[in-house]
């Protein structure tokens, strides 16, 4: 009756190159494209999850705390605000709409990485600076689409992601990392 979850928090080191579907995929830990954040998520829950089942819905780490509350039978306090949703219905194979896009606020404080914000769905990705990608055809995000020349489908996706990205508010920190700023400025 125990739920086992295996997941990683990021892609592989940039020193590692893997192969997927006959294509070389360089490690992308710390980067914001697919190989940097699309990671395996494997779950086993005897009697609850059908053996061999596969689900390609979008999930993110915000979903794990509500999931663990749900599995443990703990009611979420009304004053506790959570962005995530329980994955229990998905794990049990229920056909529900979970998420059709995910928001990421990437603001690394530990290394010389550039902060970023973006919203993505299963095909499209929009960054706060306006870069827009068809990730089905450009998984490494090398060629941003010209947003003045989008077809109807791409324009609809852009509009949806732009509205959602803008709705999150907030701002990014300075582009200098704490390593560049020095430890004393971090502690002040």
Protein language model annotation of sequence segments:
Residues 1-5, 34, 101-102:
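Active-site regions of oxyanion-processing enzymes, predominantly non-cytosolic
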Residues 1-17:
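Metal-dependent active-site segment of extracytoplasmic phospho-/sulfohydrolases and closely related
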Residues 12-32, 49-53, 57, 62-138, ...:
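C-terminal cap/loop subdomain of S1 sulfatases and analogous C-terminal strand-loop tails that border
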Residues 41-44, 176:
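Conserved N-terminal phosphate-binding loop of PLP-dependent enzymes in the Aspartate aminotransferase
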Residues 52-54, 147-150:
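Second-shell loop/turn segments in exported
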Residues 139-144:
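Surface-exposed loop/edge segments in extracytoplasmic proteins
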Residues 150-176:
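Charge-dense polyanion-binding interfaces
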């Amino acid at each position: 009756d125990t739920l086992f979850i295996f997941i990683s928090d990021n892609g592989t080191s940039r020193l590692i190159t893997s192969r997927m579907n006959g294509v070389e995929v360089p490690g992308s830990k710390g980067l914001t494209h697919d190989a940097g954040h699309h990671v395996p998520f494997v779950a086993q829950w005897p009697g609850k999850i059908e053996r061999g089942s596969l689900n390609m819905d979008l999930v993110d780490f915000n979903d794990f705390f509500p999931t663990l509350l749900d599995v443990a039978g703990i009611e979420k306090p009304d004053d506790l605000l959570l962005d995530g949703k329980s994955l229990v219905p998905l794990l049990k194979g229920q056909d529900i709409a979970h998420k059709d896009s995910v928001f990421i606020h990437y603001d690394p404080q530990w290394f010389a990485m550039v902060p970023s914000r973006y919203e993505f769905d299963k095909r499209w990705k929009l960054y706060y600076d306006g870069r827009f990608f068809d990730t089905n055809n450009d998984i490494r995000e090398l060629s941003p689409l010209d947003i003045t020349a989008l077809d109807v489908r791409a324009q609809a996706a852009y509009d949806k992601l732009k509205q959602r990205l803008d709705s999150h508010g907030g701002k990014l920190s300075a582009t200098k990392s704490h390593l560049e700023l020095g430890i004393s400025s971090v502690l002040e």
